[in-house]
């Protein structure tokens, strides 16, 4: 016999799913109707009536598919099929099935009924496919909407950043309204240059060099570039970059290279020499043979410090006293690619001891002399040191303790005035990592944006 069961859900599909969970996927849907429409405050409600064929205890024969209450004396098979067909049609409308997908006509329904095939299988399968397609379309539409919103948000953020930049420039102009700085030649420094002028002045740059840069900028910088602080700083950065000289590291050795480090006491010559030894022997693509000679026989612990580094790096080290011994050790280290010479630190005012170093340099060997200076030294003292050690024939400059200085204006001024190139920079105390080949770009960045250790940034 056939029994009828009623199930409800927020959607027709949900109600059908509940019915199928009780009676199986082949459940015959007899009727579907919308009880309550979905609103903003309440969910929809659909009711579905299913017909289930159950075995009767008294009647083993198959029960009719249509309830007896629906039979009429005039009701024939054609009317039953019509009623079932209209029920299926109503389900299609509720599930959103288009007319093009209605491929089960009245005649086909009749044929299926005659063959005892379940009428609901094909429409339900079509409903599932349509629901899946609709879900995919909805997801694609949602994705497009999200992308549009994200693009719009990015444009709004860019616009906000642009407005903030304009506000910052306006504030700087307001702050500099009372700016009345003049250089020694009574040339007014425009308000637009106030920020960069103060920054360069605080760095320790020689005033005459700074005024020279300002004068050059006023003459050459287009007016349209003075609109905001960013373009002014960019232009000033380029001027500074051209102001100093840096020499690239020369590793094309046709013969052994002898490098002597000279300079005052306490600038870090010995530590810098250890960094160079490690760099040449271990840190480059080619591992060069390195030997060390020290002339520092006066400072307590100097030889011990260098010997410790030399033993760690498995390289020879010799201490010499006079030019004759120096020549012998140079010959003994003939097999080396680099010979590094450490010297005793001398005051720039001790002309006699500085002149004593010249005996070693004038021994007939091609020696590159590097003056080691600390950027913590003010420009006036730095210039005195350079002038005093200049008698040795300075080839390059090495600057140390960049991590201990707040400004590099003194460095820029000395290099600009001496026209000597910078070879290396010591950016920290770690051996061997904190040694960097000097570049214009890095020095300008440190001066305008503050010091940064490239080794720690990479880590």
Swiss-Prot record:
Its main location: membrane. One of its GO terms (biological process) is protein targeting. It is found in: Cell membrane. It is a peripheral membrane protein. One of its GO terms (molecular function) is GTPase activity. Gene3D superfamilies: Flagellar FlhF biosynthesis protein, N domain, P-loop containing nucleotide triphosphate hydrolases. GTP binds at residues 263-270, 342-346, 400-403. It holds the Pfam family SRP54. Belongs to the GTP-binding SRP family. Necessary for flagellar biosynthesis. May be involved in translocation of the flagellum. This is Flagellar biosynthesis protein FlhF. It comes from Helicobacter pylori (strain ATCC 700392 / 26695).
